Amino acid sequence: MTWLLDTDTCIDALRHRPSILRRLKAVSPDDVAVASMTEAELWYGAWRSRDPAGARQSVASFLAPLARLPFDSEAAERHAELRFALRAQPIGERDLVIASVAVAQGLVLVTHNFREFSRVPSLTVEEWTA
């Protein structure tokens, strides 16, 4: 596994953004994962949509080939370390959970939120929208 998709990247894929779809088609699904927090955010967005049933089906289809990574003990330890390192200029809690999973698993986080995530020590970030 190489890449962990942030929620914003998943949303762009669900909205059929060409640059994201091209990158996803160019890599093996075995190399791409989402954190359980991202999965939760996607499900919440589906429930909030104008067409919850259709949105839930789209989310399920999108997630089907991808590994879902839990917030495990290693991620919890990285979370504490990163939260301490960022205490003077913290990032959002959900973003910190996602970043912690990426760091714990040694994965590159694919996000459009480069400004926020670039401050996270030991986290490699890529943007696939170009």
Predicted feature residues:
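Alpha-helix capping/helix-boundary segments
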Residues: 9-10, 75, 97-98, 115-116
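Generic structural signal for small/hydrophobic residues in well-ordered secondary structure
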Residues: 6-7, 20, 42, 79, ...
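Active-site neighborhoods of divalent-metal-dependent phosphate/nucleic-acid chemistry enzymes
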Residues: 65-110
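Acidic, PIN/NYN-like endoribonuclease modules and their adjacent C-terminal/linker elements
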Residues: 1, 99, 103-130
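Histidine- and aromatic-rich ligand-binding microenvironments
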Residues: 6, 35, 91-92, 113
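Short, well-structured N-terminal submotif of metal-dependent ribonuclease cores
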Residues: 1-34, 44-61
